[in-house]
Amino acid sequence: RRGFAQRRKQLRKNLPDDVDWGKVCEKLKFSPTARAEELSLDDWVALTREVDPFFEKEEGQGDDEMLAVVDEDDKVVGSERRDIIHRDGLKHRAVHIFVLNQKGEIFLQKRSRLKDKCPGLWDSSAAGHVDAGEEYENCAARELLEELGLTNDDVREVGKLGAHANTGWEHVRLYATLAKGKIRVPCVEIEYGEWFTMPQIDDWVEAVPEDFAPGFLACWKVWKEANQGRFEDGE
């Protein structure tokens, strides 16, 4: 019933505030009072191309992307293509970011089923490989923008994880930040996302760990250790 009601609303009332509806209508030849139910499939594709900055966005790092190769101590020893690093199990770098809201909830993403690693599993708010020549913190800011549309520049390091099988042989830096602005996700990267309280996540991880990417589970353990007081207080 709610879905039917949304179809009857004027489209401009269902779009983000930053969309210039007048310009969109002028470019796509839409009526300013157009309703969702009045658009054809081609109209919807054209509208998505126009207002969604992530539409047809390619995955942030392809197989030919050059990543830093590191040793056991996380010292850079060279660079290599992403596909070769994964094929040969070379140690490399990655970041995970937990995005929190004012309520203290954490945004988790469900990885797209188009992803080559852990498709359809729940994961950190944002995560990604560190490019060759890139610093961890810069990578965290880039991933926030690419995966969530956030321009946060105040990420805080929470902890470090050494390279091992559970992290995919990645040296990981875990960051946290407070959400600033509305989260917008690219469907090629993320199937779905939702806010959860820390106890909700912890209970879920304990009950059904197979729902989560291994890298997230390793990061969650570090997060719990860094925020033990919150769990003990039942927050």
PLM regions with names:
Residues 1-48:
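Class I S-adenosyl-L-methionine
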Residues 11, 40, 97, 175, ...:
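A residue-level signal for conserved active-site and pocket-lining positions in enzyme catalytic cores
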Residues 44, 94, 170-174:
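Short hydrophobic/aromatic beta-strand or adjacent loop that forms the aromatic wall/cage
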Residues 59-96, 102:
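Acidic, metal-coordinating catalytic segment for phosphate/diphosphate chemistry
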Residues 83, 157-162, 166-235:
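Nudix hydrolase/Nudix homology domain
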Residues 83-96, 101-142, 190:
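Conserved Nudix-box catalytic region and its N-terminal flanking loop in Nudix hydrolases
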Residues 131-165:
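Internal catalytic-core helix/loop-beta-alpha segment
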